[in-house]
């Protein structure tokens, strides 16, 4: 007779194998896009620009994680790179949400903090987050590069960005796992390019 731990062991194996499968499919379909995103980030930093990142829920946490890798470091000892997660200042978030509605929570910050030559990275597993799409519109209007991290076919986000990583899955957890893996790969390419020249 199987014990509860046996069924959990099988479940753990299935979940990790599912994550590996989505990563494998991402490699097959998105590797050139990942390189293109990394090259655009390098270009942004070389020209004196900064990254602004946004997302909701788990994607907000990913925005903060990615910003931390650039500002602190990823693997190499080097000077910090300018990256700001637009998800962290509760006074700003609540003021904008209260005065303008939540849909404008990131767009208003992009308008205030962004400059031509900067890049805005919007993270939305569904590709239909109104607040992220509004931020991308504000970025384009302000002369900034735009990158989306999303899932499946990209939702409507894909229509509002210059480059879009579309993880081939509809499972939110799997998409988020790939997003942070890709972000680490992008950080590695940026560090190798800017600090090993």
From Swiss-Prot:
Q: What class of enzyme is it?
A: isomerase
| Coiled coil segments of this chain | none
**Record flagged with keyword Transcription:** no
The record's keywords, sorted A to Z, are:
Carbohydrate metabolism, Cytoplasm, Isomerase, Metal-binding, Zinc
Q: Supply the name of the protein.
A: Phosphoheptose isomerase
An example of a Gene Ontology cellular component annotation for this protein is: cytoplasm
Query: Which family does this protein fall into?
Result: Belongs to the SIS family. GmhA subfamily.
InterPro entries referenced in this protein's UniProt entry, alphabetically: GmhA/DiaA, Phosphoheptose_Isoase, SIS_dom, SIS_dom_sf, SIS_GmhA/DiaA_subfam
SIS domain residues: 41-197
* UniProt keyword Zinc present: yes
* Other facts: The reaction produces a racemic mixture of D-glycero-alpha-D-manno-heptose 7-phosphate and D-glycero-beta-D-manno-heptose 7-phosphate.
Q: Which residues bind Zn(2+)?
A: 65, 69, 176, 184
| Biological or metabolic pathway of the protein | Carbohydrate biosynthesis; D-glycero-D-manno-heptose 7-phosphate biosynthesis; D-glycero-alpha-D-manno-heptose 7-phosphate and D-glycero-beta-D-manno-heptose 7-phosphate from sedoheptulose 7-phosphate: step 1/1
């Amino acid at each position: 007779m199987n014990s509860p731990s046996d069924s959990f062991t099988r479940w753990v194996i299935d979940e990790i194998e599912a994550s590996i499968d989505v990563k494998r499919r991402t490699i097959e379909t998105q590797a050139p896009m990942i390189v293109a995103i990394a090259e655009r980030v390098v270009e942004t930093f070389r020209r004196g620009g900064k990254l602004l990142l946004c997302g909701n829920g788990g994607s907000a946490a990913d925005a903060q994680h990615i910003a931390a890798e650039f500002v602190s470091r990823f693997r190499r000892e080097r000077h910090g790179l300018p990256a700001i997660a637009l998800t962290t200042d509760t006074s700003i978030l609540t003021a904008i949400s209260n005065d303008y509605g939540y849909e404008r929570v990131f767009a208003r910050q992009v308008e205030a903090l962004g400059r031509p030559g900067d890049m805005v990275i919007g993270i939305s597993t569904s590709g239909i987050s109104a607040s992220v799409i509004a931020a991308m519109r504000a970025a384009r209007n302000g002369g900034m590069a735009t990158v989306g991290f999303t899932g499946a076919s990209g939702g409507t986000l894909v229509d509002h960005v210059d480059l879009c990583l579309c993880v081939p899955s509809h499972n939110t957890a799997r998409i988020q796992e790939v997003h942070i893996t890709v972000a680490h790969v992008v950080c590695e390419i940026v560090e190798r390019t800017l600090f090993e020249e």
